[in-house]
């Protein structure tokens, strides 16, 4: 029994509430004062913060609302000064016109000022603004006509190639004396009387083997046996295989002379005279080759002497041999080639200008026609 009473005294009501318990619901007087003070302090803090915000808002300057410009854009008017009228002769004195008062300058209003709109979506407004700015510039410059169009050049490779070369026209003329003319471009064969050696510049001579006739092929102008003198102005250079000869003048057996000033050619009319070319290979490289052989011998000797411990003197001799070979090669490497052509070879004269013999030759009638003309009274 005692155990049962003791267990019932200490059992806790599981369904009961600790807050509603009589022991926990009662507060002491000191605790009540503390709770009341905390609540009062919080209330005063909230009231003080609210009054401070109202004071700050009252001290701030009032904000002004910017009115939106909804009127359409109008360009600002521009004052155009008219040119003064031309002075006219006064017939009688007249009273001077009253002084015109200067017009008051029109100050553009805010809605008349140009507006630059930069929008990504409304492209129509931007185009209207740009058009209005363009119109204002045209009015300021006094232009009523549309803006000039910029012409784009259409030049290209095809159009340039389609343009023909414009040459000056030439007028045809007749030869004044065709019987006594040897025209430009005529090729005259000639046989060399002197051999050619281009080691030095000099003169050459040839003889015409046939008669040379005029343009009509009726009159002999240069008889067979006419001698022609030419000159070699310079020798050959490295790589040349022909020599240039300039024929100066021709002299006929009747001692008629004419200046030619025409270049030489071969039998087929190719410029220059061919011949046997001597490049002087051994003269140019024989000394260097000999010195190279000697230098190789000294190098072998220096190698042998170096193995035996006495190669100092041989090395100095080898270096001197290299310098001597270089000097000999530089002295002989620039020897020019020489062309030789035998006496009696056939060459050609390419006539470079018209030859006129009308000053020394004349035509006269011969045979029966001449005798019949002489018998006429």
Curated annotation (Swiss-Prot):
Main localization of the protein described in the UniProt heading: membrane
Biased composition range(s): Polar residues: 120-132
Compartments where found: Cell inner membrane
Record flagged with keyword Ribosomal protein: no
A GO CC term attached to the entry: type IV secretion system complex
CDD domains: VirB10 (cd16429)
Region (Disordered): 53-152
Recorded family membership: Belongs to the TrbI/VirB10 family.
Purpose of the protein: VirB proteins are suggested to act at the bacterial surface and there play an important role in directing T-DNA transfer to plant cells.
Record's protein name: Protein virB10
Organism, as annotated: Agrobacterium fabrum (strain C58 / ATCC 33970)
Higher taxonomy: Bacteria, Pseudomonadati, Pseudomonadota, Alphaproteobacteria, Hyphomicrobiales
């Amino acid at each position: 029994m005692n155990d049962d009473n003791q267990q019932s005294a200490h059992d806790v009501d599981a369904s009961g509430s600790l807050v509603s318990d009589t022991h926990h619901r009662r507060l002491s007087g000191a605790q009540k004062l503390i709770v009341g003070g905390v609540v009062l302090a919080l209330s005063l803090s909230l009231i003080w913060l609210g009054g401070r915000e109202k004071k700050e808002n009252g001290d701030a300057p009032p904000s002004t609302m910017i009115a939106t410009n909804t009127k359409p854009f109008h360009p600002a008017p521009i004052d155009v000064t008219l040119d003064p009228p031309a002075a006219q002769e006064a017939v009688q004195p007249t009273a001077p016109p009253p002084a015109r008062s200067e017009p008051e300058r029109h100050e553009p209003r805010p809605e008349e000022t140009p507006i630059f709109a930069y929008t990504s979506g409304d492209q129509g407004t931007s185009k209207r603004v740009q058009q209005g700015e363009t119109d204002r510039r045209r009015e300021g410059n006094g232009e009523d006509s549309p803006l000039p169009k910029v012409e784009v050049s259409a030049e290209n490779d095809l159009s340039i190639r389609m343009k023909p070369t414009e040459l000056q026209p030439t007028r045809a003329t007749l030869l004044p004396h065709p019987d006594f003319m040897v025209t430009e471009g005529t090729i005259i064969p000639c046989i060399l009387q002197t051999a050619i050696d281009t080691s030095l510049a000099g003169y050459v001579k040839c003889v015409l083997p046939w008669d040379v006739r005029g343009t009509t092929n009726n009159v002999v102008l240069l008889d067979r046996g006419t001698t022609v003198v030419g000159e070699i102005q310079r020798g050959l250079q490295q790589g040349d295989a022909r020599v240039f000869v300039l024929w100066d003048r021709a002299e006929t057996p009747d001692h008629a002379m004419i200046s030619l000033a025409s270049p030489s050619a071969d039998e087929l009319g190719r410029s220059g005279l061919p011949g046997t070319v001597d490049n002087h290979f051994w003269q140019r490289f024989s000394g260097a080759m000999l010195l190279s052989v000697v230098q190789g011998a000294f190098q072998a000797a220096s190698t042998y002497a170096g193995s035996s411990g006495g190669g100092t003197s041989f090395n100095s001799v080898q270096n001197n041999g290299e310098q001597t070979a270089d000097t000999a090669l530089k002295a002989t490497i620039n020897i020019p080639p020489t062309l030789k052509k035998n006496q009696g070879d056939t060459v050609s004269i390419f006539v470079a200008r018209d030859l006129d013999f009308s000053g020394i030759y004349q035509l006269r009638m011969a045979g029966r026609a001449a005798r019949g003309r002489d018998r006429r009274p």
